[in-house]
């Protein structure tokens, strides 16, 4: 059984590179709106210093956010068998759900409803909702097909050994047949659940990473100090809470230390990397955020990212946990989990005022 389940770090890196190339194609495109007022040299230098500071700030915020749940695995109170664990997962799911609905999807609708696209196909069709729907359906296909593939592979690999055990036990004592078959079933169920958690964590990371690169490039390409300052603070909290949600899913995947560190690092560096790319584009590559190409690419990517996050939060995180018999049999734990969900979604919603 592959430890990574569906995607490797190399695959994620390739997706990130393709994303950067798509946005790079938006460089040197003509604006469909009037150009911004020229920025003075002094103001440009101050903006550059703020952007460099934001790289360090977002790196720390994202790193701390994604690391807390991973470190928390070593804390007894946060072990899977404890009630607090359900509350932490509900909070993380609320953060991810809000990110998709409140932060990303509205941005996609705004970009793809731009007056600049009125004379294009995008201006005559609700592409934001359409792409988000396709993205959610695609995530469902990846989720189910990948889980089914590894489940069938696991059954195939263990079928032979199971038959041998049955024959031997029948020769020795008939009562042993049921016991070994039941244990094998439990092991298979546990392995399938673990594979599913790994697939969930990696597909979820792809959706978050796409959004992180886009917001990083937007900040890096901005030349307004009045815009950069509030964005620095808001995006720091944004990365921290997104990191909490992703870190919680990675911790459940129970992967090797190397894979866990790679996934946490990959998330932490994407927003700072996006800022660096945006900084380079605004400095010498002629990036125009309001060109038709940039608007369409950003809108489509945001819509796809929103579809992934909404599906994953509702289906793979919330539905799974809130249908858990342990949660449903404990009224106070059930209410506490809902409260955590509301707090997670509410905290992330407040950031939409500034970010």
Curated annotation (Swiss-Prot):
Q: How does it sit in the membrane?
A: Multi-pass membrane protein
**Keywords, A to Z?**
Cell membrane, Ion transport, Membrane, Signal, Transmembrane, Transmembrane helix, Transport, Zinc, Zinc transport
Q: Which residues cross the membrane?
A: 52-72, 84-104, 125-145, 199-219, 230-250, 261-281, 295-315, 335-355
Q: Listed GO molecular functions? A: zinc ion transmembrane transporter activity
Task: Please give the record's induction comment.
Answer: By zinc starvation.
Q: Which residues lie on this side of the membrane: Cytoplasmic?
A: 73-83, 146-198, 251-260, 316-334
Show the disulfide pairing. Answer: none
Q: What is its main location?
A: membrane
Localisation: Cell membrane
Q: What else is known?
A: Zinc uptake is inhibited by copper and cadmium ions.
Q: What does this protein do?
A: Mediates zinc uptake from the rhizosphere. May also transport copper and cadmium ions.
Query: What is this protein's record name?
Result: Zinc transporter 1
| The species this protein was found in | Arabidopsis thaliana
By which gene is this protein encoded? ZIP1
